[in-house]
Amino acid sequence: MPIANGDSLGCAMKADIQDYTKALEILEKEYTTRDGLDVDTLLDSDKHGALTYNDFLILPGYIGFPASDVTLDTPVTKRVSLKVPLLSSPMDTVTEHNMAIHMALLGGLGVIHHNCSPEDQAEMVRKVKRYENGFILDPVVLSPKATVGEAKALKAKWGFGGFPVTENGTLRSKLVGMVTSRDIQFHTNLDDPVTAIMSTDLVTAPAGTTLAEANDVLRSSKKGKLPIVDADGNLVSLLSRSDLMKNLHYPLASKLPDSKQLICAAAIGTREEDKHRLKLLVEAGLDIVVLDSSQGNSIYQIEMIKWVKKTFPEIDVIAGNVVTREQAAALIAAGADGLRIGMGSGSACITQEVMAVGRPQAVAVRSVASFAARFGVPCIADGGIQNVGHIVKGLAMGASTVMMGGLLAGTTESPGEYFVSNEGQLVKAYRGMGSIAAMEDKKAGAGSKDSKASNAGTARYFSEKDRVLVAQGVAGSVLDRGSVTKFVPYLVAGVQHSLQDIGVKSLDELHDGVNKGIVRFEMRSASAMAEGNVHGLHSYDKKLYS
């Protein structure tokens, strides 16, 4: 090809050009370091200051596989793993039973907040555990004397129909019939006994039948429910057709391997009264308890971890929040099964501003997660997540999962209230648990004057006995995001494509690549951040997914 600047320059350039087929060989021989920075150099606070997610990028690697091959399986505690590394925060405008159910169905986990009475929180746990089951070991059972009105009330309460009727109205009593949604739907006399409408032509399976065998019987029977009975015809458990359909629609669902129930997590404080709360939650079927505190390195939390592990050894404990190795070490030594990392980085949190205490999230996650990994303790990057990129960066820093509050607060499944903003946009209420609005909420204390002593916000920020409440959070609103059934799959697909760009097929590969210096990073200047965002357009529509 002709050289524009003359033959002499062209000859000189030609003499320096090497055999292109040896590019990889020359790269390996002559370049002793990789492009970019390893994670330790990146996070050297002496050189760069403390960094958070927007301060750096991950460099691309080699793509040799489709994004669909990327798996996101990850532990959330020592004993519990998820298919998707996403959690919803235990905030009263983010996670109640509806969010917890859908996060679990989508492969993640929702942590139910505790800014409510213990009984209400236990009821939410119960709803999660009943939503999708394998063998239902504690089905709602009716007696022959129960009325049609009572059956309808139970359907309205639990959100499902199909109740077995036994002689004594209890489990392990002789099965006499089934009341289905169709039986009660158009029956007008609510005082009639259920025996007047129940179905007696039942298909059953014997006790000892495996779940796979029972599912086969249920498929072929075309019934909605399959009662499991012992040799004497006594009801011992139940299987639901609706769960078969959920299995088809939600293949990544977070379920226990034995019961096939959705995994449920809930938060509590570290006060003495929280022990009673936890007992109710465990009775309702709780799997994981999250000890909720803005500063987890306290004698209260250490003693609570030890008490929970001794009293309920089957329950996994996630402790926190922490941002330093020193904080983490005390909780790990006490027996924590997982750690929550973050202090002041949440979108509705002002702890760093008001208290001058906290740590930028990227360096906090790396410092704690790399230490906790030595003891097999998974870590949650909690706070500061605004987009898919932040999720990936939190995972790259060593977190096993990422917890989101504001990012999910605008979804249909969050308990916040919808309203129209002054600009005419549909928004949802969202507040930090350190906001005055959250700390003055009286639901946890059943409306009593001393409800501050039971409030989740005051407990989280050690403010139960304060005469003057000092806010560490704000109350506001977030734009409507639609349902998590569309938004979370978008986040998952985004993480898969990001890991594909990095050149890793799993979170284990990502962590291993970061630790070995294979996955590299680059600092970002203010100009680089501007360049990496939308620029130079007169107008644009930023639609994130379809």
UniProtKB/Swiss-Prot annotation:
Tell me the SMART domains matching this sequence.
CBS (SM00116), IMPDH (SM01240)
Q: Which UniProt keywords apply?
A: CBS domain, Cytoplasm, GMP biosynthesis, Metal-binding, NAD, Oxidoreductase, Potassium, Purine biosynthesis, Repeat
Superkingdom as given in the UniProt entry: Eukaryota
Location in or out of the cell: Cytoplasm
Pathway(s) it belongs to:
Purine metabolism; XMP biosynthesis via de novo pathway; XMP from IMP: step 1/1
Q: Which InterPro entries match?
A: Aldolase_TIM (IPR013785), CBS_dom (IPR000644), CBS_dom_sf (IPR046342), IMP_DH (IPR005990), IMP_DH/GMP_Rdtase_CS (IPR015875), IMP_DH_GMPRt (IPR001093)
Q: Where is the CBS domain?
A: 135-197, 198-254
- Output the Gene Ontology terms for molecular function: IMP dehydrogenase activity; metal ion binding; nucleotide binding
List, from the UniProt record, the residues annotated as the active site of this protein.
349, 460
Q: Where does NAD(+) bind?
A: 292-294, 342-344
Required cofactor(s):
K(+)
Q: Recorded E.C. number(s)? A: 1.1.1.205
What are the transmembrane regions?
none
**Catalyzes what?**
IMP + NAD(+) + H2O = XMP + NADH + H(+)
- Give the enzyme class: oxidoreductase
**UniProt: K(+) binding residues:** 344, 346, 349, 531-532
Q: Which Gene3D superfamilies does this UniProt record tie to the protein?
A: Aldolase class I
CDD domains documented for this protein: CBS_pair_IMPDH, IMPDH
Q: Where does IMP bind?
A: 347, 382-384, 405-406, 430-434, 472
This chain's function reads: Catalyzes the conversion of inosine 5'-phosphate (IMP) to xanthosine 5'-phosphate (XMP), the first committed and rate-limiting step in the de novo synthesis of guanine nucleotides, and therefore plays an important role in the regulation of cell growth.
Which HAMAP family does this one have?
IMPDH
Please name the NCBIfam families in this protein's record.
IMP_dehydrog
Protein family membership: Belongs to the IMPDH/GMPR family.
Instruction: Quote the protein name from its UniProt record.
Output: Inosine-5'-monophosphate dehydrogenase
Q: Which organism is it from?
A: Aspergillus fumigatus (strain ATCC MYA-4609 / CBS 101355 / FGSC A1100 / Af293)
